[in-house]
Amino acid sequence: MERKVFSKDGKEIGTINLDDRVFNIEISHGSIYNAIKNELSNLRVGTSSTKTRSEVRGSSKKPWKQKGTGRARVGTKRNPIWIGGGIALGPKPRDYSYRLPKKVKRLAFKSVLSLRAADENNFKVVENFNIESGKTKDLALIIKNFASFNGKVVILLGNDDQMIKRAGKNIRDLKILSFNKLRVVDLFYAKNLIALESAVNKLNEFYVK
C-alpha cells in the first residue's frame, strides 16, 4: 500500500510503501481492547486503602449484655454496621498490572496502525526533520500544516530525537513517540497521526518479523 509523503511545509514530495502486513491487516478489535485495558491497568497506582474492623480505633468490649435490654445484639462498636466502625470488603493496596501475551500485543499494534492508515485525511507521512532550536513554535508551525489542535495529535519518530520531544513538551494534547515505544491507547485515541518517513520504515521492519 502506498501513501503520499509530504515535506514539513505540507507539500507533496513523493510516495512511500506501507507494508500490508503491518498497515493493512484485518483489524482485530478484541486485541485492541485487551491492549488498551492492559496499558491502563498497568498505569494504576493501586494505593486505595480502608480500615477493617480490626484496624479502626475503639474498644473491642461488648457494648451491652447479649440479652435482656430489648436492643439488637452487638459484639463490638467496631462493627461495620456502626458509624466509626470498620469497612467491610473495602479496597486494599494491590497491584493491578498484568502481562499481555506477546502475540496479542503485536496484533493490537498492527491492528491500530491499520485502522489509522485507512484514514488518509488524518494519517500523514512526513519527511524526516529536525528541530535544532528545540523551540515549541518551530514544531507548532510544522504540525499546523497537517493537523488542527482541536484533538489529540501523535507524532511517530524513527529515533529518540530529544530536541523534537523537548519542542513538543508545551503543546497541549500532543504525544511524541518513538517507533519502539508506542502505546495502543495513544494511537487509538489520536485524532491526527503524523509519521516520519524513518518511523514508517522502522515499523515496516519491526512488525513484519
Swiss-Prot record:
Which segments carry the region annotation Disordered?
46-71
- Give the CC-aspect GO terms: ribonucleoprotein complex; ribosome
| Keyword rRNA-binding attached | yes
Q: Does the keyword Transmembrane apply?
A: no
Looking up InterPro entries in the UniProt record yields:
Ribosomal_uL4, Ribosomal_uL4-like, Ribosomal_uL4_dom_sf
Subunit record text: Part of the 50S ribosomal subunit.
What the protein does comes down to:
One of the primary rRNA binding proteins, this protein initially binds near the 5'-end of the 23S rRNA. It is important during the early stages of 50S assembly. It makes multiple contacts with different domains of the 23S rRNA in the assembled 50S subunit and ribosome.
Q: Do you know which HAMAP family this protein is assigned to?
A: Ribosomal_uL4_B (MF_01328_B)
Family that this chain belongs to: Belongs to the universal ribosomal protein uL4 family.
Q: Protein name, please?
A: Large ribosomal subunit protein uL4
Originating organism = Borrelia garinii subsp. bavariensis (strain ATCC BAA-2496 / DSM 23469 / PBi) (Borreliella bavariensis)
